[in-house]
Amino acid sequence: KRTITFSPVLRERLGHHIHGEVWANNIKKVLKDNQLLHRPIHIISANMHSVMNSIFAPKLLQKQLNATDEFDIFEALSTSGNDKLRTKVEKEALKKGMIYIEDESGTNINVQIFDTSKIDFSKTSYTCTAKNDEEKPVLFVMDYAFGEQAYETIDEFLKPYSSKDKTKKEYLNVASVSIMGKAGILEGGKGD
């Protein structure tokens, strides 16, 4: 048996996630700029439309689609040719607490951030029990990432946010991480 060692430079490069670091820092800056950095953050790896549709689509489209079941609404949204419905839901979400961050780091992982203090839960199927805005959670939805890429991006995101001059570190209040996808565990087709 032999011990294999790596040079300090190689160890640093292997542990330094260039794209993931840029991705995470961009997102943490947006959280900071919107006073969301210290709120409870729930990280969800999912299709970009899933959380947005589940929060905003049922009440927004119920009458228009004459639907009695939320799943009928979700099915209508996933039908090709319903771009106008999808756009309507996205516009509503952007007006009511969703921030969309298109990736510019090279990870190709876009992000949606939902500030639940701006969501009127009486118009959703959900409730929020937090008493004041500082306690209301932030839903952080990252487009599906798997394997090494998921590890790299989450690893970098969970690190404290550093100021530009690197003198102050701010820790995130991560309440949960949900990275379970449907791939291989549920029936259905792509986009379900």
What is each PLM-predicted segment?
Residues 1-192:
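Accessory terminal and edge-of-domain segments that mediate assembly/interaction
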